[in-house]
C-alpha cells in the first residue's frame, strides 16, 4: 500500500510537467544570456583587433611622413650650404687666379733678369736694356689684397637638440586608447515615417563641441551623414516602416578638428505607418513619399487631407513649413475627426487648426489666445491626449473630450476639444489660398 503522505500520481505528473516547463524556460533564458555574452565578447575582440590595426597604420604613416619631412628639411639645408659656398668662394677663386698669374709673371722676369746679368754689360747691353724696360712696365710693388680669415665665411650648422625633447613629449602624449567611445546612443523612438535618435555623453572629461549622426539600412554597406550640430537629439525622416536601420554617433572635442570614435551602432525601426497627403488633389503637388505638399498655381480651393486617419492620441504630429506664400486668414493647418469635402478651410466643426497668421480655431471658433504667425522654417506641433473617450452610441452621451496642445515658435496654447463621437484615429489637413506654401508632415 502507498504511504498516507505520498502524492497522487496525477499530482506528481503535473508537478513534473511544470518542472520541465520551468527548466525549458530557464534554459531559454540562459541561452539568450549566453548569446548576449558572446556578442559582448565578440565586440571586445573585434574592436580590440580594429584598434590595433588603426594604431599600427597610423604610426606607420606617421613614421613615413616624419621621415619624409626630415629628408626634405635636410635637402633644404644642404642646398643653403651649397649656395653660400658657391657665392662666397667665387671672389677668392678670382683672386687666386690673379695671384697665380702674378707669380708666373715674376718667375719669367727673374729668369730673364738672371740671364741678362750673367751676360755682362758689354756683351748683353741690349738684353739688359730690354729687361729693364720690361720690368718697368710691370708693377712689382702692386700686391692684391687677400681677406683675413675672420672676414670670410666659416660655415656651420645650428641644430637645437631641444627639438628631440619636444618631439619626444608630443609623441609620448600622442594618441589615447579608450575602453568606450565618449558618446553613446541613448534612445530610439519610433515616429510615423521617422525615428527620433537621442544620444548622450558617457565620458565626463570629454567636452563636446559638435555631434555627428549617421544611419543606414541594415542591408546597406555604408553609413551616411544625417546630422552634424550641437544638439543631442535628431529625428531621421524618410524611414520605411518595419525596416531595420542602424544608427551611430560620434563627437568633436572643444577646439579640435578630429572626430571621436563612433559609438556602438544601435538598431531600430518604426512600425508606425508614415503620414501621407492625399494624392490627386488639383491644387497641391506632392513629393515622392507624399509627406510634403506644395500649394501650386492651380485655381483650386479646399482642404488637402491625409490619405488615411493615421494620427493617434498620445503621439506628436509635426508640420514643418518649408516655404511660404502670401498669407490669408482662411489658411489652416490642423487635425479633424473626419474628412468633409466642400469646406475651404479646417476652420469648421469637428476640427482644430492654426491659421498662417497664428490664430487658433476650435470647432470653427477662433480662440482668444493666439500663436506667432507662421514663417518659413516654422514648426507647428499637435499633441492630443484623451480626457474622456466617449462611446460610439450618441444616445449614451458619446461626446469625447480631448486635451490639445498646439506649439509654434516657442509658444503654445492648451485647450479641450469636444467631439460629437468616440475618439479614434484622426485625419490631418491643410488649406492655403495662395501658391508657394510647402508643408512637411511627420
UniProtKB/Swiss-Prot annotation:
Residues annotated as signal peptide: none
GO biological process: negative regulation of cell growth; negative regulation of G1/S transition of mitotic cell cycle; positive regulation of DNA-templated transcription; positive regulation of receptor signaling pathway via JAK-STAT; positive regulation of transcription by RNA polymerase II
UniProtKB keywords: Coiled coil, Cytoplasm
Stretches assigned to coiled coil: 10-46
Domain Fibronectin type-III, residue spans: 181-274
Cited SUPFAM superfamilies: Fibronectin type III (SSF49265)
Name assigned to this protein: Cytokine receptor-like factor 3
Natural source organism: Mus musculus
Amino acid at each position: 500500500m502507498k504511504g498516507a503522505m505520498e502524492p497522487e500520481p496525477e499530482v506528481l505528473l503535473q508537478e513534473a510537467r511544470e518542472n520541465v516547463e520551468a527548466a525549458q524556460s530557464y534554459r531559454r533564458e540562459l541561452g539568450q544570456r549566453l548569446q548576449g555574452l558572446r556578442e559582448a565578447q565578440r565586440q571586445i575582440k573585434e574592436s580590440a583587433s580594429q584598434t590595433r590595426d588603426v594604431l599600427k597604420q597610423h604610426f606607420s604613416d606617421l613614421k613615413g611622413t616624419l621621415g619624409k619631412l626630415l629628408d626634405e628639411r635636410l635637402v633644404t639645408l644642404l642646398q643653403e650650404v651649397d649656395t653660400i659656398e658657391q657665392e662666397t668662394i667665387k671672389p677668392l677663386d678670382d683672386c687666386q687666379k690673379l695671384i697665380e698669374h702674378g707669380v708666373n709673371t715674376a718667375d719669367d722676369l727673374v729668369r730673364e733678369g738672371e740671364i741678362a746679368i750673367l751676360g755682362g754689360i758689354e756683351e748683353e747691353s741690349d738684353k739688359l736694356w730690354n729687361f729693364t724696360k720690361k720690368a718697368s712696365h710691370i708693377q712689382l710693388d702692386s700686391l692684391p689684397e687677400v681677406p683675413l680669415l675672420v672676414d670670410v665665411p666659416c660655415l656651420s650648422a645650428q641644430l637645437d637638440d631641444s627639438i628631440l625633447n619636444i618631439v619626444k613629449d608630443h609623441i609620448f602624449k600622442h594618441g589615447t586608447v579608450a575602453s568606450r567611445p565618449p558618446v553613446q546612443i541613448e534612445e530610439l523612438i519610433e515616429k510615423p515615417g521617422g525615428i527620433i535618435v537621442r544620444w548622450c555623453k558617457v565620458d565626463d572629461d570629454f567636452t563636446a563641441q559638435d555631434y555627428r549622426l549617421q544611419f543606414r539600412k541594415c542591408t546597406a554597406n555604408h553609413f551616411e551623414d544625417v546630422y552634424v550640430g550641437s544638439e543631442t537629439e535628431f529625428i531621421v525622416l524618410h524611414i520605411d516602416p518595419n525596416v531595420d536601420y542602424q544608427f551611430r554617433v560620434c563627437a568633436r572635442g572643444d577646439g579640435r578638428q578630429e572626430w571621436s570614435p563612433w559609438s556602438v551602432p544601435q538598431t531600430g525601426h518604426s512600425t508606425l505607418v508614415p503620414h501621407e497627403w492625399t494624392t490627386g488633389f488639383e491644387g497641391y503637388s506632392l513629393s515622392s513619399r507624399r509627406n510634403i505638399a506644395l500649394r501650386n498655381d492651380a485655381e483650386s480651393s479646399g482642404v488637402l487631407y491625409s490619405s488615411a486617419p493615421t494620427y493617434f492620441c498620445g503621439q506628436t504630429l509635426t508640420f514643418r513649413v518649408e516655404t511660404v506664400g502670401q498669407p490669408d486668414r482662411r489658411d489652416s493647418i490642423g487635425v479633424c475627426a473626419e474628412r468633409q469635402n466642400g469646406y475651404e478651410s479646417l476652420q469648421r466643426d469637428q476640427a482644430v487648426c492654426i491659421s498662417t497668421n497664428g490664430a487658433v480655431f476650435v470647432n470653427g471658433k477662433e480662440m482668444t489666445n493666439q500663436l506667432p504667425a507662421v514663417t518659413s522654417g516654422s514648426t507647428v506641433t499637435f499633441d492630443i491626449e484623451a480626457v474622456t473617450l466617449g462611446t460610439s452610441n450618441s444616445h449614451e452621451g458619446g461626446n469625447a473630450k480631448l486635451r490639445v496642445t498646439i506649439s509654434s515658435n516657442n509658444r503654445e496654447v492648451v485647450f479641450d476639444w469636444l467631439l460629437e463621437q468616440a475618439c479614434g484615429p484622426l485625419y490631418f489637413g491643410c488649406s492655403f489660398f495662395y501658391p508657394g506654401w510647402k508643408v512637411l508632415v511627420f
